[in-house]
Amino acid sequence: MLHWLDAIVIPFLQSLYGAMGYVGVAVAMAMKGRPVQTRASRQEDWGVTTRFRPMAAGTFKAAVDAQGYPIAMEVHNTGADYAGDQQIRGLTSPPYWMPNYRYAHHKITTHVPVMTRRATGASPNCFYMESFIDELAHAAGKDPYLYRRELIARNPNGKPGVGGVNRKDDWLKALDMVAKMSDWGKPLPEGWARGIAIEDRRRPSRPHSTIGAEVVTVEVTKDGTLKWHRVDIAFE
């Protein structure tokens, strides 16, 4: 018979991607026969020794052809430098075809201690790029899914020092799959909309990484609030 109030041991441990998991294992081994729950209090998780995700900002501008596809793009982003290439991930070699692409990153110094917090540097950079691609598709009057697909399909296979995109077929497969899963193109009720995005966690030194595509179906309610109805995700 288990007496739950006496049998469950709840040590308060730091929780960052399982980095303190070995402590939980040690506690569990010392408390054999009892389930061990590991968690961190808010004060411990965000205590005086914590590091924060850095603030970041980016600017984008592009020149487009007669069909609305980019022929040149210039991207600048800035943020506190940490953990090597974190701040430039996702922007050094986007999957989209652009005959002319210029990227600059500006490091800043801050008194706030910074580091990854629940995600990597590619998170804001993905938001920047995908938001801008949406703006370009809207300006061109094109479907954002098909606009992305065309730009990825046009991009040649990646070559060192030349550009292009590695695993192009996988990018297209993930994009097509999430569009199919979400019934992309199917009419929605009034006030509803779908959004689509695709990225990976590439680093300059690691060109192959998991590709993730996502479609979110939302509704703007009568009182102006945003309601999420569905999220479809495809990984390749």
Can you name each region flagged by the protein language model?
Residues G33-Y82, L188, R194-G195, R202, ...:
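Phosphate/diphosphate-binding loops
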Residues P54-F132, A234-F235:
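Glycine-rich loop/linker segments at domain edges
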Residues P35, G158-A193:
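Amphipathic alpha-helical
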Residues A104-K107, H138, K180, W184:
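Conserved helix-loop functional segments at active or binding sites
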Residues L2-A30:
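Small-residue-enriched transmembrane helix starts and helix-helix packing motifs
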Residues T59-K61, D134, D183-K186, R202-P207, ...:
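Generic recognition of flexible, low-complexity loop/linker segments
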Residues A28-M31, G79-A80, D85-R89, R117-I152, ...:
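Alpha-helical support elements that line or immediately flank enzyme active sites
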